[in-house]
């Protein structure tokens, strides 16, 4: 069975050959690999801050709007993940982790996708909301380019007090950009029911139009094991297999340890507890992500 991890983070020091080796050890055919968060290239970080979620600003506060948002950092982050992707672009799908407050961000997103071949954009709402007007030119450009967006949603263990900006209902304004495919990560835990309801809202918006729901759900953990069965048992029947994707949420070097465990646990839930067919399980591990990226399945 092919497995595509829809949620993996660069650390910034990996090579494409490193990533492919770790993928092989983990049994992964393909990964979606997010670039570094650009401000971490010029801001201090905690030693244990693996993903760059808590860069310090000048006042010592974690995250937030007073960090330095530099265009050159966005470009450097894009260049690194593009270099990793270039080793095998059929297996490594790079996405730019974009900071919307960086100068020239719309142009840098276009450059990353058109000139560098990246597959889309990743964002975490950090003291901004998905419905803020500053986001609209970004949505328009990504919609024009036909690429997807991947958002963090749910509790946020970083960026200061930003969880309130990550509630799934805050993403409803994306329905004004109907050709923009987007995913909410972590099933928005602990707001799983709200996430699924938002998926239903986007479904209602396209009912009778012949258009596909523009929202996908990334099921990478955020849901601890105690909530995992309930979350999948709710999301899969309501949303359908084609819009519910498998993800791990780690850095490439940790894939050999983490990915097989997460895949086995989810497969046990889907097959053993929910009684899904082999074809349905394959859609979860591969086909849903392929559809998200606009590929024929």
Model-identified regions with their sequence ranges:
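Mobile, glycine- and charge-enriched loop segments
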Residues: 1-10, 82-95, 201-202, 207-218
């Amino acid at each position: 069975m092919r497995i595509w991890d829809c949620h993996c983070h660069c650390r910034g020091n990996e090579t494409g050959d490193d990533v492919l080796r770790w993928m092989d050890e983990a049994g992964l055919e393909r990964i979606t690999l997010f670039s570094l968060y650009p401000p971490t290239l010029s801001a201090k970080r905690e030693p244990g801050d693996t993903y760059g979620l808590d860069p310090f600003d000048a006042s010592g506060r974690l995250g937030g709007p007073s960090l330095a948002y530099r265009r050159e950092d966005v470009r450097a982050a894009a260049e690194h993940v593009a270099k990793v992707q270039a080793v095998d672009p059929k297996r490594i799908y790079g996405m730019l982790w974009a900071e919307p407050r960086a100068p020239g961000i719309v142009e840098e997103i276009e450059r990353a996708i058109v000139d560098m071949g990246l597959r889309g954009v990743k964002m975490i709402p950090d003291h901004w909301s998905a419905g803020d007007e500053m986001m609209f030119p970004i949505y328009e450009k990504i919609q024009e380019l036909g690429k997807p967006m991947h958002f963090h949603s749910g509790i946020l263990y970083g960026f200061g007090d930003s969880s309130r900006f990550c509630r799934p209902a805050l993403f409803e304004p994306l329905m004004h950009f109907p050709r923009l495919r987007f995913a909410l990560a972590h099933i928005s835990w602990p707001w799983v029911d709200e996430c699924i309801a938002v998926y239903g809202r986007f479904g209602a918006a396209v009912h009778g139009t012949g258009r596909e729901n523009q929202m996908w759900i990334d099921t990478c953990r955020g849901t601890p094991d105690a909530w995992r069965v309930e979350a999948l048992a709710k999301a899969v029947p309501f949303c359908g297999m084609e819009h519910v994707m498998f993800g791990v949420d780690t850095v490439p070097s940790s894939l050999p340890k983490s990915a097989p465990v997460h895949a086995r646990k989810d497969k046990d839930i889907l097959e053993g507890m929910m009684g899904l067919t082999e074809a349905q399980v394959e859609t979860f591990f591969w086909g849903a992500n392929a559809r998200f990226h606009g590929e024929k399945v």
